[in-house]
Structure formats: C-alpha cells, structure tokens
C-alpha cells in the first residue's frame, strides 16, 4: 500500500468482515485503531494483537488516522465519518480496502447467497494442504485458525465476496466462485434482475487467464455460466450436466462420503472418477461447497491426495452446523442459517444425520424485511422438524413495519408455520424464561438446532453449557 498510509481506523471494527481486514493490516505492520458500540470476541482478539479500540463512536477516535474504513452499516452522520470528512481524511468502504489488499495477490473470491463462508474456508484449507499458505479474509471464524483472517506468505488471497450491498463489484479476482443466486437483500437491489446483473458483473471482472467456478445445479448460476462465452468456466454440482460432479452421496451422522467424477465434454475426453471424499460436515449443500473448493484446488494443481487428507481433517467454521454438545441425552447444534433456503438445507442435513431422533428447531428470525420478503418460504422450510420454537424477530436496526408483522411480531410467523407443517410450533418465551420454556419441551435423545443470524448463538452456547456442566438447562 502507498507509504503515506500508516494508520488505518475502522468504524464498526467488531463486525465479522471489518475485523478480518483489520487483522490482516495489523499483521502487515499497519497501525490499526477502531470503534464499535459493543464488545465481542473479534475486538478482544484485535486488541491482543495491538489494535487500539474504543467502545462508542466519537470524533476524537480518528485522531492521527490516515484513512477511515467503514462498512455499509455505518451511517453518513456517524461522528467519526463526519470528522474524517471535515479533516479531508479519506473514508474508504470496506470492500475497497479489501480490493486494495487483493491487488497484492492473486485473488480468489467466493460469492453467492448461501455457502460463501464455508466454501472460503474449504478453499483456504485445500491451498494450505499444498503448502501454498494463502492469505484469508473470511466471514466466519475458521476453527483451525481461531480467527476469520490469516496473513500467508503465498501468492493467493482467498476471500468471501459480500453481495449484500453490491460492494463485491469493487473486487477484481483472478478466480471467481458463485455458489448460488437467490432473491435476497432486496432492500438494496430492488429487483431480482438487479441481483442477476450484479453477479454477472462480478464474474465478468476476472481476467482472460482467470477462472469462473459456477454451480451448475442452480438454475440462475447455470444460466450465468452459459453467458460467460469469453471466460474460462468450470461448473460443479450433483447433476450429470456439470464438469465436476458428486455421486454416491452417503451421510452417516454428521460425516458425508461421496465420489467425485470429472467430465470433460469440451475436449472429447472420457469422464473419470477422481476418488472418494470423506467430509466431516453433513448435507448435500456442503457437498456442493466442497466441489467448488475442489475445482479451485484442481485449477491450482493441488494434488488429489492432499485434497482428500485436508477434507477429512477439516474442522469447519463456527456457527456452520456447529456441534456444541452431544451425548445420549441430547445433541445441541448452532447454525447461522437465517434464509429459508439455508434453513431447509440445514434441517434436511439434521434429519438425514439423526433419522431416528426428534428434531427441535429454535429459530430467531433476522430482520423484518427478510421475513416479509420470504414469508411464504419461511412457513414451509421446517418440514424436517418435529418441534419449532420461534423467538422474537431480531431487528438488526430495523423498525417494525406497518401491518400484522409489525404489530404482532413473530406470532405471525408461528401461525404460518403451523399451517404448513406437521410440527408442534410455538413462540419461545421471553428472555427471562426462554431456557425454562425450551428445557420443558425436550425429551431424551432430542436434537436441538439453534438457527439465526442475530444473537441466538449466545443462547445456544448458554444452553449447551448447562448440559455440559450437568446442571439443569431449564435454569440457563
């Protein structure tokens, strides 16, 4: 980076995307400061590495900064942003800073409505297994790293590309991955055509020598692959129309086995089996994510045997089918799923992994706008649950809308799920009584799955701690 820039300040530094970039810059030797409204583990980790971070936002916080980095969640009237502009200090969007880091390496950017974080982690693991030591900026905590970031000495930077506000268009990766493309973040895009155009623009930015790795199972992404006439493209998926295919998928508990077939229709070569993979994650969606990572690894000539070993030892990502507690009495899982497609995939994986056990879903809806946009699908995505307990909607800064959802909250969703599911569905008790309520619903051998992108993970860990300490979980 230009030598005049030495001190970089992050507004909202505790966010998962911001903290990863901040950690990379710290490791590269920059002075990093930041602010956030609340404390969390990301902030503690950055402080331990030398960042100066204050709680709350004040104009004085940017003192000495050469640049101020913001996420899309930071408003224009934030006192630190206003102070920076008054002092003519550059205010840099998070994605622009990530793009600057990508200029120093060959970029591998993983985009998609779902599966970005897991796929990013898998790509990093496969490159690491080949001693390529990539730099990593992820949207979740990789368990093997204990962080969402890593500064490697290799030639590649692997990152999650966030499409939520269109800022992934600032990136210029060498390899672009698209896992899927569903209607989401419509408050930003307005129409699904705008979403399609954004993903088209993202993939189009790869150079002529680059590669687009696209999920051929998803109809929208498959159409995108057909449009990329002047780009190198590899498709992957479970269907027999793709270049890299998974077959003979078998799930035992949370372990999945499958065979990988490579097709080469463009050059007339015969299809061949590459071998069998053992993956310590359940679900066809994770098989698909793994195929994407394998496609990237094969492009970079990672030996197959190293891929097999790396995947067998892959420890996963926090809050992605995160097994918090397992014993004969109960199994407790924490998962980030908050979109109907994600919830359906997670619940199917749970049902396949625990076919003889009762499945209890504890769901915290995230944002009024998302519930309104996807109400039809939210009411139908819990078909693999026996019990569904719905928490109040996590606002994430949104105000209640006019109409039944704003007036009655999550009870509207409870009633909708009841109409379209055979599960027992109820509203979870308030903060003071939720543990008592949940504990009273459980039976021996139940599988409890906490779902959501808000603060539901805190409850999941609290509830699991109660069981692990052999205390009464109804009191947590």
Swiss-Prot record:
Protein origin, superkingdom: Bacteria
**Any signal peptide, and if so, which residues?**
none
Does Ligase show up as a keyword for this record? yes
Quote the EC number: 6.3.2.8
User: Pathway, per UniProt?
Assistant: Cell wall biogenesis; peptidoglycan biosynthesis
Disulfide topology? none
Q: Which GO terms describe its cellular component?
A: cytoplasm
Which enzyme class?
Answer: ligase
Q: Which cell locations does it reside in? A: Cytoplasm
HAMAP family to which the protein is assigned, alphabetical: MurC
This molecule's function is given as: Cell wall formation.
Family membership noted in the UniProt record? Belongs to the MurCDEF family.
- State what protein this is by name: UDP-N-acetylmuramate--L-alanine ligase
Q: What is the lineage of its organism?
A: Bacteria, Pseudomonadati, Pseudomonadota, Alphaproteobacteria, Magnetococcales
Give the encoding gene's name.
murC
């Amino acid at each position: 980076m230009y030598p005049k820039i030495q001190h970089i300040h992050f507004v909202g530094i505790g966010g998962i995307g911001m903290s990863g970039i901040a950690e990379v810059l710290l490791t590269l030797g920059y002075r990093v400061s930041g602010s956030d409204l609340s404390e969390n583990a990301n902030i503690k980790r950055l402080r331990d590495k030398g960042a100066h971070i204050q709680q709350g936002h004040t104009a004085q916080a940017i003192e000495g900064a050469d640049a101020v980095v913001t996420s899309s969640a930071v408003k224009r009237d934030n006192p630190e942003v206003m102070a920076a502009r008054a002092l003519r200090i550059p205010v840099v969007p998070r994605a622009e800073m990530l793009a600057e880091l990508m200029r120093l390496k060959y970029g591998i950017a993983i985009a998609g409505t779902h599966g970005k974080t897991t796929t990013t982690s898998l790509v990093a693991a496969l490159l690491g297994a080949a001693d390529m030591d990539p730099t990593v900026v992820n949207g979740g905590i990789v368990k093997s790293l204990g962080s969402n970031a890593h500064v490697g000495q290799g030639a590649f930077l692997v990152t999650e590309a966030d499409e939520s506000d269109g800022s992934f268009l600032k990136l210029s990766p060498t390899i672009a991955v698209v896992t899927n493309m569903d209607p989401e973040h419509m408050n930003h895009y307005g129409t699904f055509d705008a979403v399609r155009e954004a993903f088209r623009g993202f993939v189009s930015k790869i150079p002529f020598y680059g590669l687009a790795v696209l999920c051929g199972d998803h109809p929208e992404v498959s159409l995108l692959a057909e449009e990329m006439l002047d780009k190198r493209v590899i498709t992957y998926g479970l269907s027999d129309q793709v270049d890299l295919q998974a077959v003979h998928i078998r799930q035992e508990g949370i372990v999945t086995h499958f065979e990988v077939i490579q097709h080469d229709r463009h050059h007339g070569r015969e299809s061949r089996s590459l071998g069998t993979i053992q993956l310590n994650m359940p679900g066809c969606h994770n098989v698909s994510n793994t195929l994407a990572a394998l496609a990237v690894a094969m492009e970079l000539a990672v030996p197959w045997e190293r891929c097999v070993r790396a995947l067998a030892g892959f420890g996963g990502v926090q809050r992605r089918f995160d097994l918090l507690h397992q014993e004969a009495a109960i199994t407790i899982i924490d998962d980030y799923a908050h979109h109907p497609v994600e919830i359906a995939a997670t619940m199917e994986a749970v049902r396949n992994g625990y076919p003889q056990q009762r499945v209890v879903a504890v769901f915290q809806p995230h944002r009024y706008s998302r519930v309104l946009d996807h109400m039809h699908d939210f009411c139908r995505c819990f078909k693999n649950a026996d019990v569904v307990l719905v928490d109040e909607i996590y606002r994430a800064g949104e105000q209640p809308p006019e109409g039944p959802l704003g007036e009655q909250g999550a009870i509207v969703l409870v009633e909708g799920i009841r109409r379209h599911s055979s599960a027992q569905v109820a509203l979870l008790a308030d903060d003071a009584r939720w543990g008592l309520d949940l504990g009273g619903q459980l039976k021996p051998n139940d599988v409890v799955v906490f779902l959501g992108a808000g603060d539901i993970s805190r409850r999941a860990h609290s509830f699991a701690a109660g069981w692990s300490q052999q205390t009464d979980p109804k009191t947590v």
